[in-house]
């Protein structure tokens, strides 16, 4: 809820709502990640702000700390244009059915690490509003987000 309201203000959009997801993260790595349900220490470097079927669907872009290929990136501007173009193409098309002519999603902006960290913090606020019993974890997580990429 908080993330969606912030995006509506940031992007000057009145007619969109949040997609209900806690947060979406695309992790760049030289290594394959074979399954979900694992924890990886990542550094957010940017965000691709998207509207998908009228819903805000931001994608945080992050790198694995210490990754041999991407680990030195600290901002989306550190990505080569070809890498960023491929990520954007994937995010715009991965939900499309074969033969579909109308795209489901549009990219409204591509922003750097500062905006990504702001969105992460807002998502954490959304979480704590939904699960107030986890307030202590929230406080330590905010401090961890503040220190990322330093």
Map each language-model feature to its residues.
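Hydrophobic N-terminal alpha-helices or hydrophobic patches in metabolic proteins across all domains
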Residues: 1-150
């Amino acid at each position: 809820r908080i993330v969606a309201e912030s995006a509506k203000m940031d992007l000057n959009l009145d007619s969109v709502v949040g997609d209900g997801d806690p947060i979406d993260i695309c992790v760049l790595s030289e290594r394959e990640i074979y399954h979900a349900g694992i924890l990886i220490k990542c550094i957010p470097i940017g965000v691709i702000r998207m509207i998908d079927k009228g819903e805000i669907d931001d994608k945080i872009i992050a790198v694995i700390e210490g990754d041999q290929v991407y680990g030195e990136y600290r901002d989306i501007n550190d990505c080569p244009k070809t890498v960023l173009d491929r990520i954007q193409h994937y995010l715009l098309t991965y939900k499309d059915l074969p033969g579909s002519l109308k795209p489901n999603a549009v990219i409204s902006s591509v922003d750097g690490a500062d905006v990504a960290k702001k969105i992460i913090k807002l998502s954490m606020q959304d979480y704590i509003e939904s699960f107030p019993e986890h307030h202590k974890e929230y406080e330590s997580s905010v401090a961890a987000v503040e220190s990322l990429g330093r």
